[in-house]
Amino acid sequence: MEPGSVENLSIVYRSRDFLVVNKHWDVRIDSKAWRETLTLQKQLRYRFPELADPDTCYGFRFCHQLDFSTSGALCVALNKAAAGSAYRCFKERRVTKAYLALLRGHIQESRVTISHAIGRNSTEGRAHTMCIEGSQGCENPKPSLTDLVVLEHGLYAGDPVSKVLLKPLTGRTHQLRVHCSALGHPVVGDLTYGEVSGREDRPFRMMLHAFYLRIPTDTECVEVCTPDPFLPSLDACWSPHTLLQSLDQLVQALRATPDPDPEDRGPRPGSPSALLPGPGRPPPPPTKPPETEAQRGPCLQWLSEWTLEPDS
């Protein structure tokens, strides 16, 4: 597979207010490091110099984040109003994301909900990594929830592998990678949370891809499906042999799922009160005044947890 380049940028959605790109793997979104010759910011500036905004730090308003090693859908707001509209969707938990991944081993269950709380790893030598609650050095674990559906079983370079669809219901740093590792099925090619191998035929990339994205803003619904990169025609090392669930059917189900009501100020997915039965739920909170800058802080912190891997 060809590495990324400044000239090679795939656009999967464009409107007056938004762009959605299909980010190449092993490409940072932005960086202040002079040695970074390839970033998504530089790709955008090369393709769309007229869209760069000098009032922003990097020239473009990225609505969310993807890890350096992760490929797939990433939304860019083209003006301040559009960025605010996307921000409200994230704040109100109305954004839907789904990822494709190749995981080590054959997962026997057809569907799994992973609910390990995730916190920072303070263990020496594990800086900038995350871990599940109960692990040595786990600090400030927060509730985390991921739905997993097994699509196919097969072999990758002769080793058993499962192709899965992952839907994060919370947004912790490295959530999908940590949850899959905790399940005993790390992402193929994940050198941080998977098995470190000295084999020369190790995968050329981490097999995690942001496949589906839906942001129902006030003015338009930004919805995209990016091409599936985990096909035998694209990677000869991947050889599926058993189909368990149709990806097309899952996409149809994702598209048919109604968006949450923005007026519903109920608990966030995975929060304790969200799991209470109907009669036991607390009454709805009173109408709140407009959000202040101080009140925006917690949500901005939440958004920052869809974080990039640190420069190294």
From Swiss-Prot:
It comes from the Eukaryota. Belongs to the pseudouridine synthase RluA family. GO terms for molecular function: pseudouridine synthase activity; RNA binding. CDD domains: PseudoU_synth_RluA_like. Keywords: Acetylation. The gene is RPUSD1. This is RNA pseudouridylate synthase domain-containing protein 1. The keyword Magnesium does not apply. Gene3D superfamilies: Pseudouridine synthase (3.30.2350.10). Pfam families: PseudoU_synth_2 (PF00849). The active site is at residue 67. InterPro entries: PsdUridine_synth_cat_dom_sf, PsdUridine_synth_RsuA/RluA, RluA_PseudoU_synthase. The keyword Aminoacyl-tRNA synthetase does not apply. Residues 256-298 are annotated as: Disordered. The modification N-acetylmethionine is found at residue 1. GO terms for biological process: enzyme-directed rRNA pseudouridine synthesis. Residues 279-289 have a biased composition (Pro residues).
